[in-house]
């Protein structure tokens, strides 16, 4: 556990609080022993001077008994000097060990503090790195959500614009088809009603899809909003053009839709056509029978590969005409 430099400093100061007094006591004892040793050495020197008398360069003993006593006295004093010296050495060793003990403790505490400091710094770096990663994840999620929202808004705006163009294009194409039919001599009341109904149903389909798309975009989650936007783009991308040949060709309606768009969810309000009961896509041909129940058919469902010449009737209406 990280204790902090303040804690280590307090503990160390507490441990050395008695050190000055201990050192002072030892030094005082050593000084006292020095004084005693000095006195003994001086005393021994005097005894030695009295023991040896030099006359004319020769040495002679004064009295045997006195010399023997003086010699024993000198030995005792020398022995005492040695004892004092041993005590001083012992006190010096104690003082050294006392100081060395505190130095070792200081080294151990410094090493421990350094290790704990490195661990604390490493843990702080890990926390900072983890916090940075979390912030990056949140920012990335926010950016992704913002991009998704912007993309959805752009898709909705594009779908609305395309749907408006679709409605105006459907109205203009219907008028052109009526004019072309009159010039070719094949325009009739039934055909006009039929085209008008088809235009109304297609326009209603586009408008319904647009309204449903905007409603689901505002009320559902971001995933359903994305699906609705894609469906709106698919429906709005169907470029509808009424083509009526000046030479009396059958009424053909072309839907430039991507076949992949058919895999998307179909709006239940969008009208269906043909025997297959599917929505409008690709090229479609209209039956000239005003009473036809289906009216519009996909080329592939009625076996057509190109625009038929003249008037065209669906298989059901053809059988009815043959019977009549």
UniProtKB/Swiss-Prot annotation:
Q: Name one GO biological process term.
A: epigenetic regulation of gene expression
**Zinc finger intervals, PHD-type:** 271-320
CDD domains (UniProt xref): ING_ING4_5, PHD_Yng1p_like
Keywords assigned by UniProt, alphabetized: Chromatin regulator, Growth regulation, Metal-binding, Nucleus, Transcription, Transcription regulation, Zinc, Zinc-finger
Q: Where is the composition biased (Low complexity)?
A: 140-169, 201-229
Here the segments flagged for biased composition (Gly residues) are 170-186
Task: Name the segments for region: Disordered.
Answer: 120-237
Enumerate the residues marked as the site Histone H3K4me3 binding. Answer: 273, 284, 288, 296
Domain of life per record: Eukaryota
The GO cellular component terms are: nucleus; protein-containing complex
Effect of deleting the gene: Cells provided with nutrients proliferate slower than normal. Upon starvation, the progression of differentiation is delayed in a cell density-dependent manner. Cells form tiny aggregates and more aggregation centers compared to wild-type cells, resulting in a higher number of tiny migrating slugs. Cells form complete tiny fruiting bodies 3-4 hours faster than wild-type. In a similar manner to wild-type, most cells remain as non-aggregated single cells in the presence of caffeine, which is an inhibitor of adenylate cyclase activation.
Give the subcellular location.
Nucleus
Residue numbers binding Zn(2+) 1: 274, 276, 298, 301
Keyword Ion transport annotated: no
Q: Name one GO molecular function term.
A: zinc ion binding
Residues binding Zn(2+) 2 are 287, 292, 314, 317
Pfam families named in the record: ING, PHD-1st_NSD
Query: How is the quaternary structure described?
Result: Interacts with H3K4me3 and to a lesser extent with H3K4me2.
Record's function text: Involved in regulation of the growth and differentiation transition (GDT) process, probably by regulating gene expression via histone modification.
Q: Please give the record's comment on domains.
A: The PHD-type zinc finger mediates the binding to H3K4me3.
Family statement: Belongs to the ING family.
Q: What is this protein called?
A: Inhibitor of growth protein 1 homolog
| Organism, as annotated | Dictyostelium discoideum
What is the name of the gene encoding this protein? dng1
């Amino acid at each position: 556990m990280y204790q902090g430099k303040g804690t280590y400093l307090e503990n160390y100061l507490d441990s050395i609080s008695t050190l000055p007094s201990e050192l002072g006591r030892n030094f005082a004892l050593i000084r006292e022993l020095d004084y005693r040793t000095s006195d003994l050495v001086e005393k021994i020197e005097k005894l030695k001077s009295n023991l040896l008398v030099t006359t004319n360069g020769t040495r002679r003993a004064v009295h045997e008994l006195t010399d023997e006593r003086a010699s024993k006295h000198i030995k005792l004093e020398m022995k005492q000097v040695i004892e004092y010296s041993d005590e001083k050495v012992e006190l010096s060793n104690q003082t050294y060990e006392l100081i060395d003990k505190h130095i070792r403790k200081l080294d151990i505490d410094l090493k421990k503090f350094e290790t704990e400091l490195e661990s604390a710094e490493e843990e702080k770096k890990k926390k900072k790195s983890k916090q940075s990663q979390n912030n990056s994840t949140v920012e990335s999620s926010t950016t992704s959500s913002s991009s998704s929202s912007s993309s959805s808004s752009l898709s909705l705006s594009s779908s609305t614009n395309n749907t408006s163009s679709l409605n105006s294009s459907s109205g203009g194409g219907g008028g052109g088809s009526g004019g072309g039919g009159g010039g070719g001599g094949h325009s009739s009341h039934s055909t006009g009603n039929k085209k008008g109904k088809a235009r109304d149903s297609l326009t209603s389909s586009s408008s319904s899809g647009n309204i449903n798309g905007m409603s689901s975009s505002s009320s559902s989650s971001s995933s359903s909003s994305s699906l609705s936007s894609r469906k709106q783009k698919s429906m709005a991308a169907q470029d509808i053009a009424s083509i009526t040949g000046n030479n009396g060709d059958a009424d053909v309606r072309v839907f430039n839709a991507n076949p992949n768009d058919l895999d998307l969810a179909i709006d239940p309000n969008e009208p269906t056509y043909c025997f297959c009961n599917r929505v409008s896509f690709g090229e479609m041909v209209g039956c000239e029978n005003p009473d036809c129940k289906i009216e519009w058919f996909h080329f592939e469902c009625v076996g057509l590969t190109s625009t038929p010449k003249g008037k065209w009737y669906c298989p059901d209406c053809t059988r009815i005409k043959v019977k009549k």
